[in-house]
Amino acid sequence: MIQQESRLKVADNSGAKEVLVIKNLGGSWRKFTNIGDIVVCTIKKVTPGGIVKKGQVVKAIIVRTKRGLKRSDGTQIQFSENAVVLIKDDKNPRGTRIFGPIAREVKDAGFVKIASLAPEVL
């Protein structure tokens, strides 16, 4: 379960390695988020020469969680790490590549560009 103060890995080439969740968007009393939800994050670890800087506040979409989720057809999908993709205000990704698989729920949430950049959509 992703909540405030959770540290997540970044699954794109924007230059960030790790982010810290500041706020879960989508409700005033919302405590947890899942795959396909948008969160506000701050950058904690970066690679040199990246697009983003340490301490910068950005929006991100959750693409993988350890908790996983159950689908309506009865299947359950679960990943080995919690990961996000950094997005701009127009919901397009900041990076040009995405690493690792993403869940189909990201595409269903309206992030078609992120799904097309991903090497595998589960």
From Swiss-Prot:
What GO terms in the biological process aspect are recorded for it? translation
Keywords per UniProt: Ribonucleoprotein, Ribosomal protein, RNA-binding, rRNA-binding
Report the leader peptide range: none
By its UniProt entry, which InterPro entries does this protein fall under? Ribosomal_uL14 (IPR000218), Ribosomal_uL14_bac-type (IPR005745), Ribosomal_uL14_CS (IPR019972), Ribosomal_uL14_sf (IPR036853)
User: Pfam families of this UniProt entry?
Assistant: Ribosomal_L14
Q: Does the keyword rRNA-binding apply?
A: yes
Q: Where is it found, in Gene Ontology cellular component terms?
A: cytosolic large ribosomal subunit
What are the GO MF terms of this UniProt record?
large ribosomal subunit rRNA binding; structural constituent of ribosome
Q: Is-annotated flag, keyword rRNA-binding?
A: yes
Subunit and partners: Part of the 50S ribosomal subunit. Forms a cluster with proteins L3 and L19. In the 70S ribosome, L14 and L19 interact and together make contacts with the 16S rRNA in bridges B5 and B8.
Xref: HAMAP family = Ribosomal_uL14
Concerning its family, UniProt says: Belongs to the universal ribosomal protein uL14 family.
Chain's role: Binds to 23S rRNA. Forms part of two intersubunit bridges in the 70S ribosome.
Name of the protein described by the UniProt record: Large ribosomal subunit protein uL14
| Species this chain originates from | Spiroplasma citri
The opening ranks of the lineage are: Bacteria, Bacillati, Mycoplasmatota, Mollicutes, Entomoplasmatales
